[in-house]
Every structure is written in structure tokens, then in C-alpha cells.
Amino acid sequence: MKIHIFLFVLFFFLVPIATRGVKCAVKDTYSCFIVRGKCRHECHDFEKPIGFCTKLNANCYM
């Protein structure tokens, strides 16, 4: 019985928390390539670091 309760808590409460990182990566990709145009390899004065585009060999968005 305790295993069923544990699985219920794990599935319904912890899984949505774990998927937030995926949504952030998708949001960063959209912001970087669609809204902002392109990624840069170096940060300039007014640019800020981003998360997912660093995996695509870029550090900042314009």
C-alpha cells in the first residue's frame, strides 16, 4: 500500500516539476531564434546570457 501512495505522489506531484526545464529550453530557443533573430558567440554590452542556446555553441542573444 505504501508503494502505491509513493508512486501516486511521484507521478502527480514531482513529474510536472521535472518538465519545467524542458519548457524553459523551448522558451529560450523560441526567444533566441524566432523573436531575437540569432544567437551570438560573445556577449556585448546590452546582451544577456541565455540557457539553451549555449548548447548550440552560442552564449548570448541580441
Curated annotation (Swiss-Prot):
GO terms for cellular component: extracellular space. The lineage of its organism: Eukaryota, Metazoa, Chordata, Craniata, Vertebrata. Disulfide bonds join 32-60, 39-53. Keywords: Antibiotic, Antimicrobial, Defensin, Disulfide bond, Secreted, Signal. One of its GO terms (biological process) is innate immune response. One of its GO terms (molecular function) is CCR6 chemokine receptor binding. This is Beta-defensin 133. Has antibacterial activity. Its main location: secreted. It comes from Pan troglodytes.
